[in-house]
Curated annotation (Swiss-Prot):
Subcellular location: Plastid, Chloroplast thylakoid membrane
S-S bridge residues: none
UniProt xrefs under Pfam families: ATP-synt_B
Name of the encoding gene: atpF
HAMAP family linked: ATP_synth_b_bprime
Note: In plastids the F-type ATPase is also known as CF(1)CF(0).
Name the UniProt record assigns to this protein: ATP synthase subunit b, chloroplastic
Quaternary assembly: F-type ATPases have 2 components, F(1) - the catalytic core - and F(0) - the membrane proton channel. F(1) has five subunits: alpha(3), beta(3), gamma(1), delta(1), epsilon(1). F(0) has four main subunits: a(1), b(1), b'(1) and c(10-14). The alpha and beta chains form an alternating ring which encloses part of the gamma chain. F(1) is attached to F(0) by a central stalk formed by the gamma and epsilon chains, while a peripheral stalk is formed by the delta, b and b' chains.
Primary localisation category: plastid
Transmembrane parts of this sequence: 27-49
Annotated organism of origin: Oenothera argillicola
Keywords in alphabetical order: ATP synthesis, CF(0), Chloroplast, Hydrogen ion transport, Ion transport, Membrane, Plastid, Thylakoid, Transmembrane, Transmembrane helix, Transport
Any one GO MF annotation of this record: proton-transporting ATP synthase activity, rotational mechanism
Length: 184
């Protein structure tokens, strides 16, 4: 606030005409001083400002160029992605159609396989039953044969006495002897 009041005071109080100097008080300066300051600023600041503006312009142009390249790359990638998406959708549709066909085919194969397995199980069951029947029949035959043999042996043992036994042995010896002579 003091600077503002000093400025107004300096407006009221003009310096003496014989002095020469640089007046920093902007309200107390004359147009010549202002034009000198502005001329110096324009002369020296023009190159700096021009360089700054040129650099800024180049950076903006480079940024625009890079953005255009990135945009073109993004558009190209987008087109590739769309083409890939379309290929994948076609492939997925093919898999879906093949999947439905495959599922139906697998269902038929599974049903046929189940029927074949059931037939094999039925055949195995029938073979097992037949085998068990044959085994039971063979066991019964063997038991009947053993009982018949035991009965025959019992009958022979009870019917044979020593004399009949000796005559049978003698007859067999004679029979074997005659067979031996025929073969010699």
């Amino acid at each position: 606030m003091k600077n503002v009041t000093d400025s107004f005071v300096s407006l009221v109080h003009w310096p003496s005409a014989g002095s020469f100097g640089f007046n920093t008080d902007i309200l107390a300066t004359n147009p010549i001083n202002l034009s000198v300051v502005l001329g110096v600023l324009i002369f020296f600041g023009k190159g700096v400002l021009s360089d700054l503006l040129d650099n800024r312009k180049q950076r903006i142009l480079n940024t625009i160029r890079n953005s255009e390249e990135l945009r073109e790359g993004a558009i190209e990638q987008l087109e590739k992605a769309r083409a890939r998406l379309q290929d994948v959708q076609i492939e997925a549709e093919g898999y879906r159609a093949y999947g439905y066909f495959g599922i139906d085919e697998q269902r038929h194969e599974s049903i046929n396989s189940t029927y074949k397995t059931l037939e094999q199980l039925e055949n195995n069951k029938n073979e097992s039953i037949h085998f068990e029947q044959q085994r039971a029949i063979n066991q019964v035959r063997q038991q009947i044969f053993q009982q018949a043999l035991q009965g025959a042996l019992g009958t022979l043992n009870s019917c044979l006495n020593n004399e009949l036994h000796l005559r049978t042995i003698s007859a067999n010896i004679v029979l074997f002897g005659s067979m031996k002579e025929l073969t010699d």
